[in-house]
Amino acid sequence: MRILVSNDDGVHAEGIRALSEALTACGEVIVVAPDRNRSGASHSLTLEVPLRVTRLGETGFNGSESYAVKGTPTDCVHLAVNELVRPEPDMVVAGINHGANLGDDVIYSGTVAAATEGRHLGFPSLAISLVGKTHFATAAHYAAQLVKGMMVHPLPADQILNVNVPDLPLDQIKGIRVTRLGNRHRAESVICSEDPRGQPIYWIGPPGSQQDAGEGTDFAAIEQGYVSITPLTIDMTAYSSLAGLGAWLDLQG
């Protein structure tokens, strides 16, 4: 089993190191990740400039081959599968993200996008995030457990798993729940300021607070001390709307 590991926090982040070390118990691990933090990159590809790659060898990854890419998480997986990793990997695992990817966070997440790219290219994939920045060993434990399960019982071809783990010691986790995505309120206002020359500058504000966080959501599972696993589909077609949209178009004449 050859496992491609990537992330969006960068190749030197604590989370990807904990993940790659844990997954060596499951097979051969190859790390291909951004050379810096690319959080919020979503599913973007770099098209206007060439991608530059630095081979890091086996430094800091428990003997695993590793590469730093000057690009996005999606670039990393795309480049790894199509060029860098030979023979091809059998699975793609993204994370461990430094912070939650709950609800509509998945739209912006480079971690989820890396897993999605893996699935798009034909490989079983999962994204794993720690809802905090302390207990990476807990998230790594569940990542290894899920990878072992996927080796025996592969996922459906059109799905990835989005996994969120409470920032708790392993013995304080209550269990695992299968969840749906919750939802947040509209993001908070943009933060406006000035640079030293008096020119306006802007910072994207923090995400909105929880809106749909009821029972059955990923938000609720985390709040109650459970690992949340949400299956995400690659096909974004709103099948339930096809007939209604056709009828609406008929009304337009």
Curated annotation (Swiss-Prot):
Keyword check for Metal-binding: yes
* Gene3D superfamilies referenced in this protein's UniProt entry, alphabetically: Survival protein SurE-like phosphatase/nucleotidase
What are its cofactors? a divalent metal cation
The record's listing under InterPro entries reads: SurE (IPR030048), SurE-like_Pase/nucleotidase (IPR002828), SurE-like_sf (IPR036523)
Q: Which cysteines are joined by disulfide bonds?
A: none
Its keywords, alphabetically, are:
Cytoplasm, Hydrolase, Metal-binding, Nucleotide-binding
> Major place of localization?
cytoplasm
Naming one, the record's GO cellular component terms include: cytoplasm
Residues binding a divalent metal cation: 8-9, 39, 97
MF term (GO), any: nucleotide binding
Catalysed transformations (reactions): a ribonucleoside 5'-phosphate + H2O = a ribonucleoside + phosphate
Q: Does the keyword Manganese apply?
A: no
Cofactor remark:
Binds 1 divalent metal cation per subunit.
Q: Point out the signal peptide segment.
A: none
What Enzyme Commission number(s) does the record list for this chain?
3.1.3.5
Q: Which Pfam families match?
A: SurE
Q: Which residues form a coiled coil?
A: none
Q: Where in the cell is it found?
A: Cytoplasm
> Per its UniProt record, what NCBIfam families does this chain match?
PRK00346.1-3, PRK00346.1-4, surE
Alphabetized HAMAP family for the sequence: SurE
> Briefly, what is this protein's role?
Nucleotidase that shows phosphatase activity on nucleoside 5'-monophosphates.
Sequence similarity: Belongs to the SurE nucleotidase family.
**Name of protein:** 5'-nucleotidase SurE
